[in-house]
């Protein structure tokens, strides 16, 4: 622009790009009602009228001027760049739902039987002329955008067509990066404590009171939360100390008054007042209905967060894990009082390393200190949790999921265990609720029920709740998944001690070790895993029942965790790809287990969500990484395309849905899961605002394997087998198809 030239005042279209975040796109600057001066969307368009009054023009010809119709066909040429003027958001939403949402679930999907078209006004004509929005995808995006606009209090909006027909791959990536992660982020502080402390999972009088338990050695946190409760008595917040030694008996005693467990906080100084206050580190939760920090979910979500450059949140979750190990003795299933005895699959070393690298690596002294604190905590967890009774099996030298605990898990539905309890209630001639109270109080002793709950708690600790692979036996299984993770701990600790800490580290107990010590532990575990878990004939790593001294034969996708951890030999990896993979590779990626291993499903033996035909993001991501590490990048790419296809297909056809798990055998409605708890992320009205944590990560990570050609195929929802069939030979090689 020439100097001295006045700058043209921007129109709405010039202020924001069509893919900006909702707070910008639907912010005050784009509200047509708040424009201080007329712009091209608020001025009335006039029509040129040529009358036949001039003798010059009428000489020999009569000009019949046709009025341009209100259906703005002239704009079709600019399709994709148009802007729509919605002058009444509420009314348009009502019309859209009445016309298109024929099943009344506040979503527009391929199952609705509406006309799949809606007339909306154009922005250039101030809504005078109209165009058609057609098809399930655009109409469902319109529903989503109008729902968001309404949530922002907007009565009128200018909508870019580009936002409605956005490439689905780009749209889902954008939503995950700029909206879903933000919606899933939590932080425990004065403003949020009441909402986060509230617990909907436990239905007892004591659970209705928001309550937080603070570790014995955290007086600053205790005073902080006491101050929170005093500053706002309406919160009705209870603040309580935990004892220095936490026993299963004490944990059970808290079940009538369950509460949130405090997490890591840091001191911040107010730049205005100069006063210091505590602020909780941020973390993300698995889904919108959760408020707790979960164990292995956090690692898998951190992978996506780091790729989206949200390092502060990933770092915050590592800080919370360090805090949990220091004060609660372990990384918890989640930070609620009834989880104090239960851990989850351990991923801390890899998580800390990945954050460290994004945090500046060894060039950043703060990052080095962070890494050291994380690994000292990991060593404590390794020794005191996984290599100690009751989880460590001395005979095999391997570890099991085997948490402590007494009585019924309080976070379950009241009638969840009625079937198993009925015969015991009848035996004692009492009702099921009465028996439950008697059992929890220790008034009756039932060894069979004790063992049932032992394995039930172990299944929950494994993260795979539930599966017939683990049911009624989990606490006795040295699983391939857990022992792969512990091998990774040993290798990671050896690497970090050697590379960053001068080959020496002193742990919480004052014991100093070197990298060779940890390498030796890893070598021993690798030998034992091969001895007890590897089956050369089938190409699977199985689990080993330490109670009866026998290897199982349940085909599970967790076999690939051995490749993720790097413990498999190249020959074992080759065998897994040749023999195990064909049994687990389905239309939409890896299935949790084979149909043969799962067995027959009946009324008395219903589906389990971690079994066939369901696929889970953790299994996909760990397998992709493992296969890639062993030179099977093409196989990883093929599996990633299959998984991304399912996600994209459901996202396009079902109103932007992103769910916890998918049926990897179905190409039409893969999000539909009937097993056990249903499917988290499916129950929303108008717009999905969070997705599901580790599934969000899987989409971000899976796309790293895709080139432009594959992304276009995904955007068109091209079925994997059709996509693979029509590839050129060089492309087929990239997917290990030839």
From Swiss-Prot:
GO terms for molecular function: alpha,alpha-trehalase activity; calcium ion binding. It is an enzyme of class 3 (hydrolase). It catalyses: alpha,alpha-trehalose + H2O = alpha-D-glucose + beta-D-glucose. Substrate binds at residues 289, 296-297, 333, 342-344, 463. InterPro entries: 6-hairpin_glycosidase_sf, 6hp_glycosidase-like_sf, Glyco_hydro_37, Glyco_hydro_37_CS, Trehalase_Ca-bd. Keywords: Glycosidase, Hydrolase. The keyword Coiled coil does not apply. Pfam families: Trehalase, Trehalase_Ca-bi. GO terms for cellular component: cytoplasm. Its EC number is 3.2.1.28. Residues 1-44 are annotated as: Disordered. GO terms for biological process: trehalose catabolic process. The active site is at residues 465, 660. Belongs to the glycosyl hydrolase 37 family. This is Probable trehalase.
């Amino acid at each position: 622009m020439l100097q001295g030239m006045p700058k043209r005042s921007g129109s709405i279209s010039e202020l924001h790009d069509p893919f900006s975040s909702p707070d910008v796109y639907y912010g005050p600057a784009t509200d047509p009602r708040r424009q201080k001066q007329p712009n091209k969307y608020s001025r009335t368009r006039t029509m040129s009228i040529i009358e036949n009054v001039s003798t010059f023009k009428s000489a020999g010809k009569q000009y019949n001027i046709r009025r341009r119709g209100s259906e703005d066909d002239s704009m079709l040429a600019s399709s994709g760049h148009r802007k729509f003027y919605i002058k009444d958001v509420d009314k348009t939403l009502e019309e859209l739902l009445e016309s298109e949402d024929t099943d009344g679930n506040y979503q527009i999907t391929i199952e609705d039987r509406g006309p799949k078209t809606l007339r909306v006004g154009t922005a250039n004509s101030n809504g005078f002329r109209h165009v058609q929005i057609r098809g399930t995808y655009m109409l469902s995006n319109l529903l989503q955008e109008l729902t968001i606009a309404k949530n922002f209090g907007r009565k009128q909006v200018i909508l870019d067509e580009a936002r409605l027909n956005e490439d689905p791959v780009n749209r889902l990536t954008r939503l995950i990066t700029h909206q879903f992660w933000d919606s899933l982020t939590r932080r425990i502080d004065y403003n949020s404590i009441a909402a986060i402390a509230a617990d909907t999972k436990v239905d007892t009088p004591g659970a209705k009171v928001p309550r937080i338990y603070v570790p014995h050695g955290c007086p600053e946190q205790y005073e902080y939360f006491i101050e929170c409760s005093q500053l706002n008595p309406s919160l009705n917040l209870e603040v309580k100390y935990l004892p220095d030694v936490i026993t299963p008996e004490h944990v059970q005693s808290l079940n009538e008054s369950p509460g949130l467990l405090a997490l890591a906080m840091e001191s911040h100084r107010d730049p205005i007042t100069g006063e210091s206050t505590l602020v909780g580190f941020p973390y993300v939760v698995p889904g919108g209905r959760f408020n707790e920090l979960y164990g292995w979910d956090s690692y898998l979500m951190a992978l996506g967060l780091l790729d989206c450059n949200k390092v502060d949140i990933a770092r915050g979750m590592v800080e919370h894990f360090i805090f949990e190990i220091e004060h609660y003795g372990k990384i918890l299933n989640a930070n609620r009082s009834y989880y104090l005895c239960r851990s989850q699959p351990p991923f801390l070393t890899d998580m800390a390393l990945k954050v460290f690298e994004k945090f500046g690596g060894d060039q950043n002294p703060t990052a080095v200190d962070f890494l050291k604190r994380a690994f000292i905590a990991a060593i404590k967890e390794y020794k005191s949790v996984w290599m100690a009774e009751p989880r460590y099996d001395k005979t095999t030298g391997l570890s099991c999921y085997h948490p402590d605990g007494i009585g019924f898990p309080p976070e379950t539905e009241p009638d969840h265990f009625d079937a198993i309890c009925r015969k015991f209630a009848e035996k004692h001639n009492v009702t099921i609720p009465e028996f439950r109270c008697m059992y929890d109080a220790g008034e009756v002793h039932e060894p069979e029920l004790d063992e049932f709950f032992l394995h039930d708690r172990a299944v929950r600790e494994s993260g795979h709740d539930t599966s017939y692979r683990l049911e009624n036996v989990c606490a006795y299984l040295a699983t391939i998944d857990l022992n792969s993770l512990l091998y990774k701990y040993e290798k990671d600790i050896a690497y970090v001690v050697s590379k960053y800490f001068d080959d020496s580290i002193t742990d919480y107990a004052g014991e100093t070790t070197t990298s060779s010590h940890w390498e030796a532990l890893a070598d021993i575990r690798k030998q034992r895993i091969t001895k007890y878990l590897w089956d050369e004939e089938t190409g699977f790593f199985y689990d080993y029942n330490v109670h009866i001294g026998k290897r199982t034969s349940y085909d599970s996708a967790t076999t690939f965790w051995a490749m993720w951890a790097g413990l498999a030999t190249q020959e074992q990896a080759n065998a897994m790809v040749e023999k195990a993979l064909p049994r687990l590779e389905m239309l939409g990626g890896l299935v949790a287990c084979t149909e043969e291993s799962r067995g027959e499903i009946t009324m008395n033996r219903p589906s389990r969500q971690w079994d066939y035909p369901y696929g889970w993001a953790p299994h996909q991501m760990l397998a992709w990484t493992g296969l890639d590490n062993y030179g099977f990048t093409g196989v990883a790419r093929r599996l990633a395309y299959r998984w991304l296809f399912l996600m994209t297909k459901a996202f396009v056809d079902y109103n932007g849905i992103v769910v916890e798990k998918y049926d990897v055998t179905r190409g039409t409605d893969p999000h539909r899961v009937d097993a056990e708890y249903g499917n988290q992320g499916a129950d929303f009205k108008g717009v999905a605002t969070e997705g599901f944590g580790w599934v969000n990560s899987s989409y971000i990570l899976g796309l790293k394997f895709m080139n432009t050609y594959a992304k276009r195929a995904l955007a068109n929802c091209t079925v994997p087998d059709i996509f693979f069939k029509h590839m050129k030979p060089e492309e087929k090689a990239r997917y290990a198809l030839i």
